[in-house]
Every structure is written in structure tokens, then in C-alpha cells.
UniProtKB/Swiss-Prot annotation:
Residues 550-574 form a propeptide. GO terms for cellular component: membrane; plasma membrane; side of membrane. Residues 1-26 form the signal peptide. The gene is NT5E. AMP binds at R354, N390, R395, F417, F500, D506. Zn(2+) 2 binds at D36, D85, N117, H220, H243. The keyword Zinc-finger does not apply. The lineage of its organism: Eukaryota, Metazoa, Chordata, Craniata, Vertebrata. It is found in: Cell membrane. A lipid is attached at S549 (GPI-anchor amidated serine). Its cofactor is Zn(2+). It catalyses: a ribonucleoside 5'-phosphate + H2O = a ribonucleoside + phosphate; a 2'-deoxyribonucleoside 5'-phosphate + H2O = a 2'-deoxyribonucleoside + phosphate; dTMP + H2O = thymidine + phosphate; CMP + H2O = cytidine + phosphate. Glycans are attached at N53, N311, N333, N403. This is 5'-nucleotidase. Its main location: membrane.
Length: 574
């Protein structure tokens, strides 16, 4: 008997079964996501400043609520996630200190949130109460570990991961936070921020042992780290990120943001999987919208979508809008108090102030120096002539088209952190190190790029990090007619700067370690508001304080940098 003939009926039965019982259809999940909202509860102008022309304004939680409700009604499996930095950025946070964040995130029905660095701006106590105690959804971070007496106090208020039931399936969400947070905010000494990848892997492994085969990494470390997590952490299927305010889009973008890549950005993991990575810019301007199909083993089959521009074509939810109006009453005193006027656009955007000289930086530095005009004598016109200011400390522009009016509310959006402008004495060699640090990772939109007053600096970005300052001149003080002279490495200079930098923030450890003398100064917002009131009408310009040499092949443009990167990627993969 031919053995093959005996197997033929069985094979036919199996083939028939395959036709009658086809493979299970992929399971589809819709991921809605926000990041870096920074207290933009109300709609804003297109550049995230105060709304001037309502027909052209964007975002706000009332408009976000409308779109989220529409999608939840239309689609069966939806998660609403936030990748951190809800705290800080407008008068809302200055007054309510996070209570507003918890209230409106609860109202929108968020499913999970990762901790961002700015959630620690009011210290751990300002995170615990109100946010951690008042939200009714999980707050996540796998790489933050508490120690000492704080460990028991904060236990159970945040988690490394959470398993969510979505329809008939379960989805694991694992959180992470920038390990640079101690340099960027005020988490104190009893929280340890571990390496993201090292901390995430064991938590993902735990989820796998619990038979969770669909895992989203939700976190706040920036696009470059997001991509590394997608590549290195085995078992992560999707990465939803924040911190770098990255705009990704497939097709023609709907507003002025230039995409840093397609949405989703696909990373090939070390074990050969295609992992979608997404962010949704910042300030509540967009709602990230990603549809992912999983097979029965939890593998990503397809992923597609795009951020949704929350413009005026989307109506504001009337119930949320009414709630906003109730909360707004407490802010009206700040909104109506006029400090002065501007007849030019005050450019405080990250696209400018983290890449090149911006006139908002010039205005703030001029105010800092003006606030320290004292002690003239026969030898010196003033005791200090220099200011440095981290570009990341400038958080919003001010639009001159609103009759040019500048209010406390406007200024609180520009300078929301509540620090002081301090006076330090530094050697010229320390200043040189600080300016090298300012551009050591130029092009990544990081906050350490310095705005200046009383200083002329020229960079050559084509040179290696640590050797990019080609010219550094400072305004003399011991002179009757101020002029610029070369920085002397061995001379001691007085410099006005934010208290954040004095304490080593944004990686300026050399200032913290090498300062010769330190005197605390006045509250930042009081310094600038006083200057505006004194000047009455403002028109700060871009004056050439910060320049890039021809060898840099760089003009400090955020858009051109991203276009250059995209061009390189296209060339490499042609």
C-alpha cells in the first residue's frame, strides 16, 4: 500500500477545514494621544500663545473633548493616553498648581498618563497633591524609583505599568520618564531616575509572563529615546512619546509645523519587528490618532493614522467649555492687568529660542540687566553687563496683534517656572565651557541653547562638540563708553542668570561647581514685568548677538534642520 495514498484524505480534510474556519481577523486598537500640553486648557493661537482671532485658534480641552467623544462613539476599541508634561506653561498652572490638570483630564476620561519632567516643577509634594491623589486613571513610570521616607509615602500613587481591558482583550501600558529630570526640574533627592531601556525591559517581561501580548510604551524622554526603546526593548509593540515636541505627519501637513518624519515613524527592532513610534507635537494643538491591528499572537500587522489638527472646524464641547468658564473667573485679575504694549511680535517659540537668537530672549536679558543697574563710579558705568538665559526657559510668544497689550497672563505663559534672576561671579574659562555646552547637541531642540545680553558669540557647528565657540566677546563695564572686548579666560566676570542655571539645570554643572560667588535675585516675572511697565512700548529686535559662521552650514532654523535630516534619510535609503 502506498503510504502517501493513505494520507491524502486526511490532507483534504485539513484543507477543507482551513477554508471553513479561516484565520482569526486582526484585532484593531485606536490610540488617541497627547503630550506636552503645558497648561493649554483654553484654545490658543496657532503658535500656542493667547488666542486672538477665535476663527484661527486651535486646541483647548473643550475642543479636544469633542473630537475624543466623536471617535469613541464611532470606534469600538479606543485608548486615550498622555505622554507627560501637562504641568506648567500658563497662568492656569500658576494659580491652580495642577488641580486643573487632574480635574479636566478626569473629565475627558484619560486611560493612562506617563510622568513628564515638568510634573516635578513644584517638587514631589506638588506632584502628589493634587495630581497623583486626584486623578482617576493610572499614572505611570517604570524608571522612577523612590527611596528613604518618600518610598512609603508615594507607594501606590504611581506604577511602572498597568493592564487595561479593552473590549475582550487586554493591553499593557508601561511608562517611562526622562532620566535627565533631576537636571530639568525639582524632583528632590529621594527619587532615582534610572536608564529608560534598562528599567523598561524587566517590566515588559513581567507583562509577558502575565500573558499580555499587546504592549504600549508610553513616556516622556524625547523622540531619540523613543526610537531606541522601540529598537532595544523586546516585547514593546508601540511607542507613544513626548518631551521633544516632535511633529510627525504623513502627507501634506495641515498647519505650519514641519514633519520630522512620517506618522507613524517605523523602527525595526533588534529582533526584526516593525514598531510604530508616535508623538503629537505639543500644546494641545493636535490629537494623535493611531490605528494598530494586532494578530492573535499580539504582533503588529498594520499601523496607520495622523495627528488631527484641532482647529476651529471642530466645535468646543459646551459642557467642558462652561466648566472652563467657571474656573476662569479666578484668573481674570491676571488677564486684565496691563503691563505695557509691544508693537512687534515677541518670538518666544521653541523653534526660534532653542536654535538661534530670538527677540524674546533679548527682551528678557535686557530686563535682567536693567534690573541690576546700580553702583556706577568713576571707573565703571555698571557693576554687571552680561546676561545668559537658557532658551528652554522661554515658554511662549506674545502676539502684537492683540492691540499689543501685554498682561500678567501673557507674561506668566512666557516665564511660568517662578525662579529668580541671580547674580554670580564666574571665570571666563567657565563662561567658555557654558557656551560650548549651549551647542554641544545643537539641532535637537534641547533647552540649554543660551540667549544672551551684553555678549556676542559666534559658533561653528561643523566642528566637534566642545570646540564650537569660535568667537566670544563681552561688554566692558570698566569703561565710559561700553564696547565689546574678547573674553579673557582668567578674568572674573559678573553675570546675571536664572536660578535654574545656578543650580546646574539643563546640564550647566560647570556653573554650579565653578561659581565664585552667588547672590540670589528678584523673582523672574517681577523683573520682566517691571521693565515692561518702565519702557511702556516695546520693539526688541534680533541684533546679531548670536551668530553662526559660514562653516557651520547652519542658520539655526528648526525647519531647515529637520529638512536636512530628512534629506539625508532619503539619500541613505534610495
Amino acid at each position: 500500500m502506498n503510504p502517501g495514498a493513505a494520507r491524502t484524505p486526511a490532507l483534504r480534510i485539513l484543507a477543507l477545514g482551513a477554508l471553513l474556519w479561516p484565520a482569526a481577523r486582526p484585532w484593531e486598537l485606536t490610540i488617541l494621544h497627547t503630550n506636552d500640553v503645558h497648561s493649554r486648557l483654553e484654545q490658543t493661537s496657532e503658535d500656542s500663545s493667547k488666542c486672538v482671532n477665535a476663527s484661527r485658534c486651535v486646541g483647548g480641552v473643550a475642543r479636544l473633548a469633542t473630537k475624543v467623544h466623536q471617535i469613541r462613539r464611532a470606534e469600538p476599541h479606543v485608548l486615550l493616553l498622555d505622554a507627560g508634561d501637562q504641568y506648567q506653561g500658563t497662568i492656569w498652572f500658576t494659580v491652580y498648581k495642577g488641580t486643573e490638570v487632574a480635574h479636566f483630564m478626569n473629565a475627558l476620561g484619560y486611560d493612562a498618563m506617563a510622568l513628564g519632567n515638568h510634573e516635578f516643577d513644584n517638587g514631589v509634594e506638588g506632584l502628589i497633591d493634587p495630581l497623583l491623589k486626584e486623578v482617576n486613571f493610572p499614572i505611570l513610570s517604570a524608571n522612577i524609583k523612590a527611596k528613604g521616607p518618600l518610598a512609603s509615602k508615594i507607594s501606590g500613587l504611581y506604577s511602572p505599568y498597568k493592564i487595561l481591558t479593552v473590549g475582550d482583550e487586554v493591553v499593557g501600558i508601561v511608562g517611562y520618564t526622562s532620566k535627565e529630570t533631576p537636571f530639568l526640574s525639582n524632583p528632590g533627592t529621594n527619587l532615582v531616575f534610572e536608564d529608560e531601556i534598562t528599567a523598561l525591559q524587566p517590566e515588559v517581561d513581567k507583562l509577558k509572563t502575565l500573558n499580555v501580548n499587546k504592549i504600549i510604551a508610553l513616556g516622556h524622554s524625547g523622540f531619540e529615546v523613543d526610537k531606541l526603546i522601540a529598537q532595544k526593548v523586546k516585547g514593546v509593540d508601540v511607542v507613544v512619546g513626548g518631551h521633544s515636541n516632535t511633529f510627525l505627519y504623513t502627507g501634506n501637513p495641515p498647519s505650519k509645523e514641519v514633519p520630522a518624519g512620517q506618522y507613524p515613524f517605523i523602527v525595526t527592532s533588534d529582533d526584526g519587528r516593525k514598531v510604530p513610534v508616535v508623538q503629537a507635537y505639543a500644546f494641545g494643538k493636535y490629537l494623535g490618532y493611531l490605528k494598530v491591528e494586532f494578530d492573535e499572537k499580539g504582533n503588529v500587522v498594520t499601523s496607520h493614522g495622523n495627528p488631527i489638527l484641532l482647529n476651529s472646524s471642530i466645535p468646543e464641547d459646551p459642557n467642558i467649555k462652561a466648566d472652563i468658564n467657571k474656573w476662569r473667573v479666578k484668573l481674570d485679575n491676571y488677564s486684565t492687568q496691563e503691563l505695557g504694549k509691544t508693537i512687534v511680535y515677541l518670538d518666544g517659540t521653541a523653534q526660534s529660542c532653542r536654535f538661534r537668537e530670538c527677540n524674546m530672549g533679548n527682551l528678557i536679558c535686557d530686563a535682567m540687566i536693567n534690573n541690576n543697574l546700580r553702583h556706577p563710579d568713576e571707573m565703571s558705568w555698571n557693576h554687571v553687563s552680561m546676561c545668559i538665559l537658557n532658551g528652554g526657559g522661554i515658554r511662549s510668544p506674545i502676539d502684537e496683534r492683540n492691540n499689543g497689550t501685554i498682561t500678567w497672563e501673557n507674561l506668566a505663559a512666557v516665564l511660568p517656572f517662578g525662579g529668580t534672576f541671580d547674580l554670580v561671579q564666574l571665570k571666563g574659562s567657565t563662561l567658555k565651557k557654558a557656551f560650548e555646552h549651549s551647542v554641544h547637541r545643537y539641532g535637537q531642540a534641547t533647552g540649554e541653547f543660551l540667549q544672551v545680553g551684553g555678549i556676542h558669540v559666534v559658533y561653528d557647528i561643523s566642528r566637534n562638540p566642545g570646540d564650537r565657540v569660535v568667537k566670544l566677546e563681552v561688554l566692558c563695564t570698566q569703561c565710559r563708553v561700553p564696547s565689546y572686548e574678547p573674553l579673557r579666560m582668567d578674568k572674573v566676570y559678573k553675570v546675571i542668570l536664572p536660578s535654574f542655571l545656578v543650580s546646574g539645570g539643563d546640564g550647566f554643572q560647570m556653573i554650579k561647581d565653578e561659581k565664585i560667588k552667588h547672590d540670589s535675585g528678584d523673582q523672574d516675572i517681577n523683573v520682566v514685568s517691571g521693565y515692561i511697565s518702565k519702557m511702556k512700548v516695546l520693539y526688541p529686535a534680533v541684533e546679531g548677538r548670536i551668530q553662526f559662521s559660514a562653516g557651520s552650514h547652519c542658520c539655526g532654523s528648526f525647519s531647515l534642520i529637520f529638512l536636512s535630516v530628512l534629506a539625508v534619510i532619503i539619500i541613505l535609503y534610495q
